[in-house]
C-alpha cells in the first residue's frame, strides 16, 4: 500500500495556502472584535453620569465643608512675636 501525498491529489499552490490562512486569521479577528463591541455596549448602559464631570469634581469639597473645618481647627501657623 503506497501513500499518496495530498499535494498530488489536490494541487494547492503557495498563494492558495496563503489566502486560506489569511481567511482563517481574519475570521478569528472579526470574532474578537464583535466581543469587544458587545462589552462596550453593556458598559455604556451602566454609566449614567457624564464622564466629563467625573474628573472635574474629583477631590473637590463644598464651601460649607471648608468653613466648618476652619472653625473647628485653630490655625497651624505660629505667630511670631517681635
From Swiss-Prot:
Entry-annotated residues carrying Methionine amide: 58
InterPro entries: Bombesin (IPR000874)
Organs and tissues of expression: Expressed by the skin glands.
Propeptide stretches in the record: 28-47, 62-82
GO CC term (a single one): extracellular region
UniProt KW keywords: Amidation, Amphibian defense peptide, Cleavage on pair of basic residues, Secreted, Signal
GO process annotations (BP): defense response; neuropeptide signaling pathway
Keyword match Secreted: yes
Residues spanning the signal sequence: 1-27
Subcellular location: Secreted
Superkingdom of the source species: Eukaryota
Keyword NAD recorded: no
Pfam families: Bombesin
Family: Belongs to the bombesin/neuromedin-B/ranatensin family.
Name the record gives this protein: Ranatensin
Organism, as annotated: Lithobates pipiens (Northern leopard frog)
Taxonomy of the source species: Eukaryota, Metazoa, Chordata, Craniata, Vertebrata
